[in-house]
């Protein structure tokens, strides 16, 4: 696999060497950083109105829709994954059964579990057993496209096919996937993504897709002025005229977050997700090879090598520890030098 040379993206990032932690927090590209600084400068002196900032929300919605093959009318905006999933969980009938991975990130678990008092049951199984566990009696499958702790990439077509066969809803957390892994909403009922990881945006911007089927099933229980058909006439009073489509599920956006998100998402479109995937996997697999691991289809590498966390810390390499294992992640601003530095730090442990 050809490595996409970083010179192709030169000038877009200014990372200090050794950042291997995009799975925790992505680094902003220069256009996103500059847009955010400009908005902050306007705010500081009062030289602004919120409407231009809100144009970034529309741009983010439209860019996300293009990235995942959705209609922008089926995309909603918010701030967190768990809040975005709450209306779906509320719409589940009493006694519904939800299937998930037993190491699923809790933002895609707790929204379902808080309904256990009305009989909703959440069942977790090992990831390799997930597809086989999709059988009659399961009402909804809630799982990540890429697992946060391990980097395992979901067999999404198999999950969709098995769920369709029994009529189960498919709800995907794409926070560790969208931005580097080609993914569309075909066959998915809901896709929710926080943008501060692989979409390299400020924390506080979440984008989601709701299928027309789910839009009919769910109630916009967090509706506010921003969910109005005309936000300017939705400020006051008891009259409610909600927006059509998924926009009725919009939560009032944190504008600064979307000011940074819009140029970051548009840059990903410009570079191309397939190109990003190629770049990320080349570096991740170079790292895996140095550890004596076989190649993988993930930009996240997890290793249980004893002492790895301490070795990284001593070498100034920033990564994460998840479920007792070192987790390294590789994105557009990662360089071959970062990989070599990481392998050199771990070599005495092998």
Locations of regions flagged by a protein language model:
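Pyridoxal 5′-phosphate
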Residues: 1-350
